[in-house]
Amino acid sequence: MLSNAGFVLVGLLGLGFLGHAARSPGPFREPAERWPYAVFFAGLLLTGLGSAYYHWAPGDARLAWDRLPLAITLMGLLDAVVAERVGLRVALRLLGPMVALAAASVGYWALTEQRGAGDLRPYALVQFYPLLAIPLMLWLLPARYTGSAGLLAAAGVYALAKVPELADAWVFSTARVVSGHTVKHLLAALAGYSVLSMLRHRRAV
């Protein structure tokens, strides 16, 4: 459960930074560009809280509150890149539907789980599509800001975080100190911090 503190900390730092950025133009040309990042950092904060809630007493009913904030977090980051590489107007129109899609993917899993055949395919799509779409947009579309490497690093570190999660039992049996799931939490929080660090240092081009 302690590994969830990283999500909470990065989420709070990110939201605080966005609040400060509203009073200084540094990382954003237009104030509305903050909204997708607000969803991202709020999602990280809620991921930490939701995951702690689940791990306190694991069960399917609580697992939805672990998965939902993370799905929203990923959609927020994807929409932030859409805002900067495709267009702010497009991103703002997509933000609500993307959050709804994230919620629907978890809701669909919960519904099918109750019927005895939990279907994670929509949730997996929400998880992995941003990891493909973000690097492609960074590569193919012109940048409006410096710091693209920070976004690429965040996507890469989060993708890396999925490896120890899939090898959870092996990591714990080898390390005897932490589980693969714990390592995943730490790496995912680091991915979130990469985004915050990028925002702190980037400039318009």
Give the residues covered by each predicted segment.
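Early transmembrane hairpin module of multi-pass membrane proteins
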Residues: 1-98, 106-116, 145-204
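Active-site rim beta-loop-alpha module in soluble metabolic enzymes
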Residues: 104-145
